[in-house]
Amino acid sequence: MNDLTANVGAQERSDSIYFAPLLPWQQTLWSQLTQRVLTQQSLPHALLAAGMQGMGKRAFVWRLVAWLLCREHDTNPLGPCGTCESCQWLKSGTHPSLQVLPIVSMPINADSDTLQDKSSSAKDKKATKSTSNSALKIKVDDIRALQPFIYQGGQGMRICVLDHAEQMTVAAANALLKTLEEPQAQVHLFLISDTPAQLLPTIKSRVQQLALQTIEPAVAIDYVTKALGHTINREAVSKMAIEQLIQLANGAPLAAVALAQAPWYSKRALWLTTWQALRSGKRSSVAASDYWQKQLSIKEFIQLSERMLLDIKRICLGLNELQTDINLSEALASYQPDALNLEVFGDSLQQTKVALQQNVQEKFAYDKLMQELACL
């Protein structure tokens, strides 16, 4: 297995996030930061890794954290050694110089962007309490609990990682401001956010953002092609197909790989055929429901439907579809759903998500969605 494939999905051991190979588009930034440390220039007190999922920002932060704490980093600028006492503490999730909020983001429990993207495309797993929005919330008491570690900790470097920083309550953000305004020697804060626009301006103005978001198209294409082994569903993949994946993933290479590996991605044309059959009355909603229950979980079918709905809306607005490989424009040439029906079906998808969190049976949810799809 090559390094790229390992980065995309083979990080099964919880400790591998700290020691995974550096992603190609992160090498320049890594060299800049490590060189700064090795030349006795301290890093900024607070750093923000921000951007959409699938860019590898969490993988970068955890790798940098491991390297900063590694006892051998002075002689190994390429990454943490993985064998010293500090690295062993990281592997066990018991490093005395590292604090993580929320606790479910600790790598012993949660994975990097790479694994988050893969998990979203793996066979459906029901959401657990540990990954719910409430579990990701950072409260004021959580920030206050960090104060002894920050202000009264022992000698040496101490690191705090605040993942999903946009989930901080206003009170928590205000409590964090004091720490940002009064930096302590040898204390480093790393904030990670998928939606930095939701961070308070006062927080963003006091942190330095890492340059993680710029990925050259050629680099992304090369990475995704190699990561997929030049195939999708065992079929040779063209450059055009890779470019479409990257476009659908908004330029995020890891998200593009996860998209290609998602069970529903290869069933987009089948969804279109089912919709046309339902709309024309050639197939009943019950029969369609029974069929699709054997193909995808309801969660995967919703993801598929959301993707298809986006392109249907684009075509109805006179825009080009993003999926050029399934003849969607041709299918809509003779019929286009009106805006109200599109809105109703979109609402049904969201309502089904909520219902599933309340333990509604998948069969019931599938039956209802097929009835709605027939009316689209």
Q: Language-model segments: what does each one mean?
A:
Residues 70, 152, 181-182, 376:
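Conserved amphipathic alpha-helical interaction elements at protein-protein interfaces in regulatory
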Residues 1-67, 75, 185-187, 194-376:
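Charged, glycine-rich active-site and insertion segments that engage polyanionic ligands
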Residues 148-151, 174-188:
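Conserved catalytic/switch belt of AAA+ P-loop NTPases
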Residues 159-163, 176, 187-194:
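Structural recognition of the conserved hydrophobic beta-strand(s) that form the central parallel beta-sheet
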Residues 101-104, 192, 215:
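Generic beta-structure capping elements
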Residues 88-90, 181, 201:
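Short secondary-structure boundary/capping segments
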Residues 2-171:
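Clamp-loader machinery-focused feature within the broader ASCE/P-loop NTPase space
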Residues 167-168, 182, 198:
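Residues immediately C-terminal
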